[in-house]
């Protein structure tokens, strides 16, 4: 999972203006970096230009996903990431950056601004912090921990069963479980298998 670009733009009536951008092109060869960066700027501007105000969208291009958020006040943000990067985290980042940007940069500067004239140093920090969505987004971190716990539980249960042995056989042979518990297990098993087929 990787973020390559984080841009803040202004969607004007005549054209889209790049206000500030941060890039991570370290995974590209040295000679490709400036071209890749220019292409990401071009793509970001094009996506904002073709998006309506008040919309969020994700555009797939080969192995990359471009997430765009254009607010009703014409402020827009674009994240370019690989296709494994979670969309929810990308949109959380865009919302956070645009809220912060609108508080720190005067609205009068948006239509006439440029990366050289706009002072918003936090963008590079956001790009590097959100490289790992688990660390940046608490929900993603919790979900990953739950997934890991599920995997551990499944591995543990499978490792307890001997080769060729099934949990159903163990339940039916069990002397510890009462008749009612065995009936409950069988009913639950049938319901779960019924739902899995649907």
UniProtKB/Swiss-Prot annotation:
Keyword tRNA processing: no
Subcellular location: Cytoplasm, Cytosol; Cytoplasmic vesicle membrane; Golgi apparatus membrane
SUPFAM superfamilies to which the protein is assigned, alphabetical: SNARE fusion complex (SSF58038), SNARE-like (SSF64356)
Enzyme Commission code: 2.3.1.-
GO molecular function: cadherin binding; protein-cysteine S-palmitoyltransferase activity; SNAP receptor activity
Domain Longin span(s) in chain numbering: 8-126
Sequence ranges assigned to domain v-SNARE coiled-coil homology in this UniProt record: 138-198
Cysteine methyl ester modification, residue list: 195
Class of this enzyme: transferase
Lipidation (S-farnesyl cysteine): 195
UniProt membrane topology term: Lipid-anchor
Lipid modification (S-palmitoyl cysteine), residues: 194
The record's account of how the chain is modified after translation: Palmitoylated; catalyzes its own palmitoylation. Palmitoylation is required for Golgi targeting. Farnesylation is required for Golgi targeting.
InterPro entries for the chain: Longin-like_dom_sf, Longin_dom, R-SNARE_YKT6, V_SNARE_CC
Positions of modified residues (Phosphoserine): 159
PROSITE patterns: LONGIN (PS50859), V_SNARE (PS50892)
GO CC terms in record: apical dendrite; basal dendrite; cytoplasm; cytoplasmic vesicle membrane; cytosol; endoplasmic reticulum; endoplasmic reticulum-Golgi intermediate compartment membrane; endosome
Origin: domain of life: Eukaryota
GO BP field: endoplasmic reticulum to Golgi vesicle-mediated transport; protein transport; retrograde transport, endosome to Golgi; vesicle docking involved in exocytosis; vesicle targeting
Quaternary context: Identified in 2 different SNARE complexes; the first one composed of GOSR1, GOSR2 and STX5 and the second one composed of BET1L, GOSR1 and STX5.
Protein family (similarity comment): Belongs to the synaptobrevin family.
Free-text domain note: The longin domain regulates palmitoylation and membrane targeting.
Record protein name field: Synaptobrevin homolog YKT6
